[in-house]
Amino acid sequence: MVLSREYPNWFFTCVSLVALDIGSHWLQMYAQLLRNKSSHKDVDESSFFILRLYYTNRIFMGACCVGAEVLYLAAHAATDPRIMAIAGPLAGALPAKVSLPLPAAPGFGTELSVECASALGQLALVALPFWAVKQAANVAQLVTSCEALVAHDFPKRKRA
């Protein structure tokens, strides 16, 4: 939520990511509870590949979680120009800035950019793929949890 204050153009993106993380985990825990599973990290073979990889390989899951947090911390630290002035070890090998244009929508940023010359920007570039996998796992978790809840509830409603 701190990032939504520091980057007002990204307010809805920041809030949506928090809602996705909390909502997908809550639904996963609730769905697993209804299935009498011992943990929300128990996944079936029929689950999405990304969820199986995420929950069966704890090192991979840890790397994704740490990568996501590092990216958020880097975005927070990037608001300080003194930190952004620290050159990274690959400053000459990378382009000065990498930008990805995004579709325009109110409350959402229109460009994702990273200053690659700074050490912080290079750290963010390393963390970005892990963050992306964690978000993909959250979406997959949300979908599978909703499907499981419907599968659990549908027979009861059909009988009623």
Report each predicted region and the residues it spans.
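Multi-pass membrane catalytic core of lipid/isoprenoid biosynthesis enzymes
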Residues: M1-L33
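C-terminal membrane-associated helical module and adjoining short loops/tails
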Residues: Q32-A160
